[in-house]
Amino acid sequence: ANDPQCLYGNVAAKF
């Protein structure tokens, strides 16, 4: 989603 929390989660998973 566009939520900041989800965004950080996606970034962590991406890296």
UniProtKB/Swiss-Prot annotation:
Coiled coil: none annotated. Keywords: Antibiotic, Antimicrobial, Fungicide, Mitogen. One of its GO terms (biological process) is positive regulation of cell division. Has antifungal activity against M.arachidicola with an IC(50) of 125 uM, but not against F.oxysporum. Inhibits human immunodeficiency virus-1 (HIV-1) reverse transcriptase with an IC(50) of 60 uM. Has mitogenic activity towards murine splenocytes. Lacks antiproliferative activity towards HepG2 hepatoma cells. Has antibacterial activity against the Gram-negative bacterium P.fluorescens. This is Agrocybin. The lineage of its organism: Eukaryota, Fungi, Dikarya, Basidiomycota, Agaricomycotina.
